[in-house]
A protein has these predicted regions:
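Active-site-proximal beta-strand elements of phosphoester/diester hydrolases
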Residues: 1-9, 83-92, 141-145, 195-200
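Core catalytic region of metal-dependent phosphoesterases/phosphodiesterases
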Residues: 3-81, 172
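Catalytic cores of nucleotide-sugar-dependent glycosyltransferases that transfer UDP/GDP/TDP-activated
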Residues: 8, 32-34, 110-125, 159, ...
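Short hydrophobic/charged patches on amphipathic alpha-helices used for structural packing
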Residues: 16-19, 131, 167
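Conserved acidic residues
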Residues: 26-28, 140, 176
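Conserved beta-sheet core of the metallophosphoesterase superfamily
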Residues: 42-57, 68, 87, 149-219
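Structural motif
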Residues: 80-82, 191-192
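Active-site-proximal loop/helix segment associated with metal-binding centers of metalloenzymes
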Residues: 84-156
Length: 221
């Protein structure tokens, strides 16, 4: 089994409780937003592979100053774990920064920690990363922070919050299963002939996934 978690937002105590309930799960995955409000990461009791959300400590990610139990999955890179091919496209979509090379995304220092966080454009994904993902083949799991289109929040009554580049990757790469977060709502849909699941906040539910069939069970807390 593979365990899958939605946005954590520093709630590592709950993550450890979930892991303790499932000692049979060798590793876990997460769709981003791990850090707490101070940008801190805590060790957990099983390997937790994760992509970036828009609320992270991007300096810690860049310097690999992370607990060993939290291996980071960079955008547009395939990671193989126990035979499972995993890749991700973390962060959010910003049209004004989409064509910027990832290495050139600015991260200026501001007068406060919050202002510095908001000014850090490393929270976004860019086109060069999307293109790398579109060229991937034989993916088992594809993780994103953003949702594909159409995705309507608040039970379908809100505006379309999905992002077209996610659909482009799903259409090109055709992973066996797609997981996303960011909206803290459970959803189950098919996009571009790919099963696409929106994960709830980790405080409410998580998934157990059969790596052979990609069938899943949503477990509520």
């Amino acid at each position: 089994m593979i365990g899958a978690l939605g946005d954590i937002h520093g709630d590592f105590a709950i993550v450890r409780q979930i892991m303790a309930r499932h000692p049979e799960v060798p590793f876990w995955i997460c769709v981003g937003d791990l850090a707490d409000d101070q940008g801190r990461y805590e060790p957990v009791d099983a390997p937790l592979y994760w992509i970036k959300g828009n609320n992270e400590n991007f300096d810690a990610i860049a310097s690999a100053a992370l607990p060993p139990s939290l291996p980071f999955v960079p955008n547009g890179v395939v990671t193989t774990i126990d035979g499972i091919r995993l890749a991700g496209l973390g962060g959010t979509f910003a049209p004004n920064w989409y064509l910027t090379p990832a290495a050139d995304l600015p991260h200026p220092r501001k007068g406060s920690a919050r202002a510095t966080e908001l000014a850090d454009k490393r929270r976004h994904f860019v086109k060069e990363e999307v293109d790398r993902c579109k060229a991937m083949t034989d993916l088992d799991l594809f993780l994103t922070h953003e949702a594909p289109r159409p995705y309507r929040v608040h039970g379908g009554r809100g505006p379309d919050a999905g992002k077209t580049p996610i659909n482009e990757v799903l259409a090109a790469a055709q992973p066996r299963l797609h997981l996303f977060g960011h909206h803290h709502e459970w959803s189950n849909q098919v996009r571009q002939n790919v099963r696409s699941l929106g994960l709830d906040a980790v405080s409410r539910s998580y998934l157990l996934i059969d790596p052979q069939t990609m069938r899943f069970e949503q477990v509520t807390r």
